[in-house]
């Protein structure tokens, strides 16, 4: 795979996306800690965005691993494939309610469009 230009592009996309997601989560956590240390509530709009940012990670990782599987060809879908094993783990992670991004995306979209927050768990 390392000589395949398509695989190289996917590797670059995956690496950059993973770093972006990681930095977003770290930034969000640091922003929450600033509020906590100052003894002020974390603004609801920020909490709604943080919730979406964390839930969408599984979706983005699944899309990236799907591209990687496609680039791997038939070797990627064999039962002993490490890539397939990771892909299935990511897929399984979406079974947890915290990783189902659709309701969090809908809530964030509504908030961004001026609606009230509907997620009272944030």
Label every model-predicted segment.
Residues 7, 14, 43-46, 50:
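Amphipathic alpha-helical coiled-coil segments and their boundaries
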Residues 1-34:
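Extended amphipathic alpha-helical segments enriched in small hydrophobics
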Residues 34, 38, 70-74, 96:
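General structural signal for alpha-helix termini and helix-helix connectors
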Residues 1, 32-48:
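Flexible internal linker/loop segments at domain or repeat junctions
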Residues 45-76, 83:
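Charged, glycine-rich active-site and insertion segments that engage polyanionic ligands
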Residues 74-122:
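Glycine-rich phosphate/cofactor-binding loops in nucleotide/flavin-utilizing enzymes
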Residues 13, 17-20, 27, 52, ...:
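Charged, amphipathic alpha-helical oligomerization/scaffolding segments
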